Regions:
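Flexible, solvent-exposed loop/hinge segments and secondary-structure transition points
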Residues: 1-113
Length: 113
């Protein structure tokens, strides 16, 4: 899932036979990154330290926040936020690695937290 800086969906891709929940999880990872301005790995760390805060924000986002690795902010070479990528389908660490690789392949900067 690719979101713009407002968290509007720009693109979503999935393979045949994949649960539609994967897209929702990927969206939640990217949405969380946009909402709080940090990659979802940093959000996972914050959730461990401030569970009530993350739970409250998740409520404000109507449950569309998944604070585990795989939601990565996209920045241009000047540091301007372009959006976020969210990936789900493997381990969270591998999801994050795939997002970072895709962003780098586009010549942009990835921010995982």
């Amino acid at each position: 899932v690719v979101l713009d800086p407002r968290a509007a969906t720009v693109a979503m891709l999935s393979e045949d036979g994949v649960s539609q929940m994967r897209g929702k999880i990927a969206h939640g990872k990217a949405n969380a990154a946009i909402a709080l301005g940090m990659g979802s790995r940093a959000l996972m760390n914050r959730a461990e330290q401030q569970a009530y805060f993350i739970q409250s924000v998740n409520g404000l986002l109507d449950g569309d926040m998944v604070p585990v690795p795989g939601g990565v902010l996209i920045r241009d070479n000047d540091g301007t936020l372009l959006g976020a990528v969210g990936i789900s389908g493997d381990t969270s660490d591998n999801d994050e690695a795939a997002a970072v690789a895709g962003i780098a392949a586009a010549g942009l900067s990835a921010e995982t937290g």
